[in-house]
């Protein structure tokens, strides 16, 4: 899968001139998905997507205003013009392309599955009848709903909640981009 930055297409997004004139690039990012986007020990946004956003802002001669976003809200914050761009591990899909425009992808990802050492999952077939923890609105959600109907999905709004569910033993495994 490919991840690209995205802007709105069905509503009128701010133009580059409008962004420059305002002095602020509004960017949606994750606050709990290291190493992509997270809040560091000093309470500041950090991660790869943050570095990318800072570079875009520098090139435009503006400052960045970050908005933390849940995976399922990445399209909504764009279509409502709450942000100019989403940099939140945002995989290009046909469904999303109907609502927003994507830039060229800036990284490639694949789905991974993490499980406890004492119940290691090494093949997707081992998930049949098991509970898989995922974040809502993610590639993992759409993949497993479409391709693995025998896997029970336990969905969370926040990545941090999904990670904690695995640590607490509320599911057999957790799937996300690796």
Residue map of PLM features:
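Extracytoplasmic small-molecule ligand-binding "clamshell" domains
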Residues: 10-89
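Short, well-ordered beta-strand segments
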Residues: 26-30, 114, 131-133, 174
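Ligand-binding cleft/hinge of the Venus flytrap
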Residues: 40-41, 53-62, 140-157
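Hydrophobic residues within well-ordered alpha-helices
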Residues: 56, 78-79, 127, 165-167
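Short helix-initiation/N-cap motifs at beta->coil->alpha
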Residues: 65-76, 119, 154-164, 168
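A ligand-binding cleft/hinge motif common to bilobed small-molecule-binding domains
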Residues: 76, 90-98, 145-146, 160, ...
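Ligand-binding "clamshell"
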Residues: 94-105, 109, 149-150
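Flexible hinge/capping segments at coil-to-helix
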Residues: 115-132
